[in-house]
Amino acid sequence: MPSLTTYTLLKQEHNARRGEFKTVHGTVQTPAFQNVATAGAIKGGLSAQDLKDIGAQVMLCNTYHLHLRPGDKLVADMGGLHKFTRWNGPILTDSGGFQVFSLAKLRKITEEGVTFASHLDGHRIFMGPEESMQIQANLGSTIAMAFDECVENPAQHDYSKDSCERTTRWLKRCKAEMERLKHEGISVNPDQLLFGINQGCTYADLRVEHMKQIAELELDGYAIGGLAVGEPTEVMYEMISQVEPYMPKDKIRYLMGVGTPGNIIEAVARGVDLFDCVMPSRNARHGHLNTWSGIINIKNAKYERDERPIDPACGCPVCRNYSRAYIRHLLKADEMLGMRLTVMHNLWFYNHLMERIRDELDAGTFTAFHDRYVKLLDTRI
């Protein structure tokens, strides 16, 4: 598959990587965080312009949800996700696999794909590798994720092994279908990229073998999936370390669905380049806010008369203009502005955390940064 993307490793400190990822929609400085806009918008009322203002590089949209509503064909008729959302930077769409296996009811898995009931109205839907690629071609995202089977954790070793083998077969079908869609001029984005997903539950032998298999397919990037789903954090870190030596050095590496600031710092130290998580926006809507001293619950009574910003060390528009007392009032009163401001702050924090990580890697001081902040940033204060 011809590719216009280039991952360039600029600097390395132990396993931590500082790089650039070039796409048709712009160059991503890595390590980077992808901001989760499930249905084409950040929950909490942030627009594409807001994302630009807070320093976001990449937006992540959800194939399953957009397929159900408003429909991927409508998005294609509107010119694709970039025109539809007015976000002109890179967009990654997941394959829909995780939602099919976590949200949908009455699933039936076959070699062809998965039949399931919509969580919206119960109507029957079939999705397999070809369908996932067709939907993502209509969406016109920068990066399409391959359709994979997401097994429950824990799962039996034998079933996990069979699932990995099926995911590899599905990946080959995804690659072939993307090539067909491009060749026939069907894809909204003819330069769409394909990432494969490593699975294997928490079995190191399966993880390593699966990574070896999919690395041979010469894809545009590689993701580690099926983690951060309830297993102990140390087990997640161990799986990353087991898989990392077998991930192509010249391709971008993506850890799906992770995580806390501490998780991200630790995963960067273990060789990961790209992240996504709903945590910063979800936590913000409930008043749990990230600071450089740890996590505060702005709803606590002690902030009722606090005139300070959320984080005196933060330069976001929220911290430059509003007090803890005011933001607490907004959330307690269920004012929409409260959610908007807290989500804006947390996403600013995450995106600027990544910028700080890149700066530390550039300066050769990431290890010291890791040791200082990996636990501190996840501490509740």
Where in the sequence are the language-model features?
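A non-catalytic, amphipathic alpha-helix used as a structural packing/dimerization or gating element
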Residues: E131, I135, D162-R173, E209, ...
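C-terminal extensions of enzymes
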Residues: M1-E20, V28-A37, G44-G45, D148-P154, ...
